[in-house]
């Protein structure tokens, strides 16, 4: 008798941490005999790996569940799982069960490694499960990691966050900060390099505070030194960096390590000291501007990107003007801009001075117009230069072109053969757009 094919599809929402979680769940399922499929209609298991940083992300999940309900009606044996940060919030798992009773499994951030076993139990018992445990359990090592997916890979170095910014739900759903042992991180990086990976991105909610809980003297600068020493590795990236914890030692370390890319994602969130204090960010605009100057002094040509929130409770027009002024001063290469979204359970959600959506939308529009003009001007200044690009594969918008990224994290689109995927090539930049540049490969 031929065994039934076991298939799965994971749909990921949110940040790189979620992308890495999804990779881990895929590895666990493949080790359990499942195979990934491209289309939801082909899947015996569908998993939504969720984000709850903003209300919009949660609404996308509820919308997707509505679409998947039709598949469940056509195939009652289909297992539907909702996993990740959204589920970890108090009361949300029960809310999902009420709104979407056809969901079979609700799985918290601290229980993802139990996924294959839980799916088999659900298939055998025909009974839904809610498994939402402590999000601050010990770091689990030696989970299966299948062959690398191309030349790039994410490597988690910390879990959780200790900062408790007043707008942010992450510490409540990811738990307190826990660092992985450096030897386990280096082991994983070496294994990835042996499989053909040449670029790793080190992941954490705040990579700059890596090692504080290990009590053996290791910090993020020291970890970067060790990763930089791995033979065969060509590039190191890292996200996210908290400005408060970006030490002078870290700046100088990054400046002299040849594999660390010349790009820092440095979320500022606001340009007003009053709003930064209300957010509990732990730094001032003056500190941030000094840090930017220090980075540019030590690392010529560095690109800087950031996150910005408009419409935080109590934000006045003068506060918002401070944000516009900071953006104009720093000249970010790119910025991820958002309207403030109240998150239940956070301090900011109950602050006085909640702003109307119309004001938030108007401020977001002005901020985006300013930043887009800066991004375009900075990209136009690069036209004519020759840059190193790691080819990531066919362009999503034009499959006949290749796409890749420079060391400064610029997205480059250029003609070339798909066999170059995973290779480092030289590209001369010929045209600039707001979000990307176009170019031509240089022979040899």
Curated annotation (Swiss-Prot):
Residues 6-124 form the MTTase N-terminal domain. It is found in: Cytoplasm. InterPro entries: Elp3/MiaA/NifB-like_rSAM, Methylthiotransferase, Methylthiotransferase_CS, Methylthiotransferase_N, Methylthiotransferase_N_sf, MiaB_methiolase, rSAM, rSAM_horseshoe. Keywords: 4Fe-4S, Cytoplasm, Iron, Iron-sulfur, Metal-binding, S-adenosyl-L-methionine, Transferase, tRNA processing. HAMAP family: tRNA_metthiotr_MiaB. Binds 2 [4Fe-4S] clusters. One cluster is coordinated with 3 cysteines and an exchangeable S-adenosyl-L-methionine. CDD domains: Radical_SAM. It is an enzyme of class 2 (transferase). This is tRNA-2-methylthio-N(6)-dimethylallyladenosine synthase. The gene is miaB. Residues 380-443 form the TRAM domain. Its EC number is 2.8.4.3. [4Fe-4S] cluster 1 binds at residues 15, 51, 85. The lineage of its organism: Bacteria, Bacillati, Bacillota, Clostridia, Moorellales. It catalyses: N(6)-dimethylallyladenosine(37) in tRNA + (sulfur carrier)-SH + AH2 + 2 S-adenosyl-L-methionine = 2-methylsulfanyl-N(6)-dimethylallyladenosine(37) in tRNA + (sulfur carrier)-H + 5'-deoxyadenosine + L-methionine + A + S-adenosyl-L-homocysteine + 2 H(+). Residues 147-377 form the Radical SAM core domain. NCBIfam families: miaB-methiolase, MiaB/RimO family radical SAM methylthiotransferase. Its cofactor is [4Fe-4S] cluster. It comes from the Bacteria. SUPFAM superfamilies: Radical SAM enzymes (SSF102114). [4Fe-4S] cluster 2 binds at residues 161, 165, 168. One of its GO terms (cellular component) is cytosol. Monomer. One of its GO terms (molecular function) is 4 iron, 4 sulfur cluster binding. Catalyzes the methylthiolation of N6-(dimethylallyl)adenosine (i(6)A), leading to the formation of 2-methylthio-N6-(dimethylallyl)adenosine (ms(2)i(6)A) at position 37 in tRNAs that read codons beginning with uridine. SMART domains: Elp3. Belongs to the methylthiotransferase family. MiaB subfamily.
């Amino acid at each position: 008798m031929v065994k039934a094919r076991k298939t799965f599809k994971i749909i990921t929402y949110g940040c790189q941490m979620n992308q890495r979680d999804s990779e881990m769940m895929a590895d666990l399922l493949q080790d359990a005999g499942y195979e990934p499929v491209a289309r939801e209609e082909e899947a015996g298991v569908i998993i939504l790996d969720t984000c709850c940083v903003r209300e919009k992300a949660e609404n996308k999940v509820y919308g997707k569940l509505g679409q998947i309900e039709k598949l469940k009606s056509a195939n009652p044996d289909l297992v539907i799982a909702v996993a990740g940060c959204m589920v970890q919030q108090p009361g949300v798992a029960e809310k999902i069960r009420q709104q979407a009773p056809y969901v079979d499994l609700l799985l918290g951030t601290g229980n993802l490694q139990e996924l294959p076993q839980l799916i088999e139990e659900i298939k055998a018992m025909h009974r839904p499960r809610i498994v939402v445990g402590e999000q601050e359990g010990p770091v689990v090592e030696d989970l299966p990691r299948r062959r690398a997916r191309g030349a790039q890979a994410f490597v988690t170095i910390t879990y959780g966050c200790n900062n408790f910014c007043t707008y942010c739900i992450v510490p409540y759903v990811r738990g307190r900060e826990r660092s992985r042992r450096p030897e386990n991180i280096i082991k994983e990086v070496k294994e990835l390099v042996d499989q053909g990976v040449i670029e790793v991105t080190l992941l954490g909610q705040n990579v700059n505070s890596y090692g504080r809980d290990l009590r053996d003297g290791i910090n993020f600068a020291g970890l970067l030194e060790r990763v930089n020493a791995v033979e065969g590795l060509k590039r190191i990236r890292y996200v996210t960096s908290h400005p408060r914890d970006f030490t002078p030692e870290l700046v100088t370390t990054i400046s002299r390590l040849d594999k660390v890319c010349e790009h820092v994602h440095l979320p500022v969130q606001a340009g007003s000291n009053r709003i930064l204090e209300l957010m509990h960010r732990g730094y001032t605009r003056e500190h941030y501007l000094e840090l930017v100057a220090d980075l540019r002094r030590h690392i010529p040509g560095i690109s800087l990107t950031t996150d910005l929130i408009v419409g935080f409770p109590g934000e006045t027009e003068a506060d918002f003007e401070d944000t516009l002024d900071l953006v104009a001063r720093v000249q970010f290469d790119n910025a991820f801009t958002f309207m403030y979204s109240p998150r239940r359970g956070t301090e900011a959600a109950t602050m006085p001075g909640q702003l109307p959506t119309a004001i938030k939308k108007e401020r977001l529009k002005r901020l985006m117009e300013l930043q887009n003009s800066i991004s375009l001007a900075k990209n136009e200044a690069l036209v004519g230069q020759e840059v190193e690009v790691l080819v990531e594969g066919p362009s999503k918008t034009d499959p006949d072109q290749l796409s890749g990224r420079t060391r400064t994290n610029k997205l480059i689109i250029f003609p070339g053969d798909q066999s170059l995927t995973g290779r480092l090539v030289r590209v001369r930049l010929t045209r600039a757009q707001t979000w990307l540049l176009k170019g031509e490969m240089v022979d040899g």
